From Swiss-Prot:
It is an enzyme of class 5 (isomerase). Belongs to the ribose 5-phosphate isomerase family. GO terms for molecular function: ribose-5-phosphate isomerase activity. Its EC number is 5.3.1.6. Substrate binds at residues 33-36, 89-92, 102-105, 129. The keyword Cytoplasm does not apply. Catalyzes the reversible conversion of ribose-5-phosphate to ribulose 5-phosphate. The gene is rpiA. This is Ribose-5-phosphate isomerase A. GO terms for biological process: D-ribose metabolic process; pentose-phosphate shunt, non-oxidative branch. Pfam families: Rib_5-P_isom_A.
Amino acid sequence: MPAERSPIDTAKFAAARRAVDFVQDGMKLGLGTGSTAAWMVRCLAERVREEGLRVQGVPTSSRTAELARELGIPVVTLDEARWLDLTIDGADEFDSEFNLIKGGGAALLQEKIVATASDRMIVIADAAKEVAQLGAFPLPVEVIPFGWQSTRMLIEEALIGLDVLGREVTLRRSGEAPLLTDEKNYILDLHLTRIGHPRQLALTLNQIAGVVENGLFIDICDTVVVGHGDGRVTVRDLGASRNIFADLGE
């Protein structure tokens, strides 16, 4: 690993390394997707290599699967694992109730399936990801390509009656073409600025024809590990007044 990192990378690495401490021998793990989750995969691989830690990893994207295999982490499918002990993943935003926005890496469908098939979900994030109210980060919604314009119109219509600010819905692109998820679906990003009732919004979106899944993770995350630019880490459990500070130096 590089000797010097930016404060943001230091925070991500610190959170990832602390979260990997929760992994025990013999566990079946959900491996998240994104820049912070990539640090976690590297830290996990280090424990596998140096400690002989025995784990099975279920990746939440083709990118994570490729990285895990390259680093020597045994990879299995969720169908093979059936149920997981722990999932560790990043988040684009989280609030005080550990509601999350995920999907900035376009892997929200597999991420949610894996997280809900786990006994526990730990989110790793830098301190900037904590918000008083969700909505500053665009909310991803995965939709099937067929009729996506109609699906977008239905989403825009549904937003009118909900407690949100901002109703712009855009198609995520990769260059000139629509971005494709691992399932060959599209992503619509909802630019809402504020989400008053995340649960209501999540339920409403998933009732719209053409919507596959949305990036709101409600009642799924149990623990958040927050990294700071100076290497400190805060571990927070939902419902417990517990803050653990640790200096994770190089």
